[in-house]
Every structure is written in C-alpha cells, then in structure tokens.
Amino acid sequence: VTNLLSGKNAFVLMPTGGGKSLCYQLPSMIMDGVAIVISPLIALMKNQVDAMRAMSKEPGIAHFINSSLSKSAIDEVKNDVLSGKTKLLYVAPESLTKEENVLFLQGVKISFYAVDEAHCISEWGHDFRPEYRNIRPIINKIGEAPIIALTATATPKVQNDIQKNL
C-alpha cells in the first residue's frame, strides 16, 4: 500500500484470504484517478465490484468491462470513469488489449494498475494465460502508472518471471 501511495511498484505474495484485494482497494480510494484491475475471471470481477458497491453510496465506484456487457452498459461504465465516479475498473487481459479500450484508457487518469492472479503471467506457473504476457506492452501504450502484482501461488521461479515481465 505504501509503495503504491508513493508511486512505486509492488509485488504481493499472500495466502488466499490474506487481504490481497485490500492492498489495491484502499489506495484506489485515496489516490486520484481510476485503478485498472486486471483479473482473469468474470465471476471474480463481479464479486469484487459488488463488494465495493456494497460499501459505497456511489454505485459507480467500481465497474468491470468484459464481453458480458452490452454496448449501452459499456457506455455507462465509460461515462462513470470519465466523470471521476469510478475508482476501480476491472478488466480481463483480453479486454485490456482491445484497441477501443486502449484508446479510451489513454484519455483517463490512471492511478495504478493492479495485476490480480499475477502467477498467470508465468510460463512456469500452473495457470499460464498467454494474454497476461502482453500486459506490460499494453500498459506502455496506455500510459505509465505504478503496478501492483498480486498472487497467492508463486514459486521463486514464477515470482522472478512475474517481476521480469511487469
């Protein structure tokens, strides 16, 4: 949390249920802009968004963009992000790489990027997702901001691979 608040990158290796989500949720509420949370599962994104909305009077505080949304729902998300209501925007790596989303995010003040389930980056990991390998080049295209990578499962080899790729 301290690293993010001071504009530095962070790597978090913490057991399931240990509070990894809080490591990016708390700074997102304090910092200017919107935090981009890269997450591999639609169900996980929905749960996180629902949990954040339950704690806020502002329903636009958290959103996700993925293939399950209609055009009008995506427009609503974008309006909330542009108006400054949204502090957390969850995206799958596949959505992050879409040109229309890259162009949109280039016009947004991003506080930081959170890479949840970061072990998916590593070829050495059990849940390797090739799209995760493209996160750093996409961030370079969208705009620089601190990165926090979070995982519960990473051998030293996987940890090194994550840090090297981000």
Regions found by a protein language model. Give the residues of each.
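Conserved pre-motif I regulatory segment
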Residues: V1-P15, C23-L26
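Conserved helix/coil segment N-terminal to the catalytic DExD/H
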Residues: G18, Q25, D50, L69-F112, ...
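Conserved catalytic network of the ASCE P-loop NTPase/AAA+ motor domain
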Residues: S28-I30, A54-E58, N79-G84, L103-V108, ...
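Post-DEXD/H (motif II) to motif III coupling segment of the RecA-like Helicase ATP-binding lobe
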Residues: Q106-L166
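ASCE RecA-like P-loop NTPase motor cores
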Residues: T2, K46, D50, D75, ...
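Pre-Walker A (Motif I) flank of P-loop NTPase domains
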Residues: S6-V12, D32-V34, K85-K87, A145-P146
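Conserved Walker A/P-loop ATP-binding site and its immediately adjacent core
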Residues: L22, G33-M55, S67-L69, A73, ...
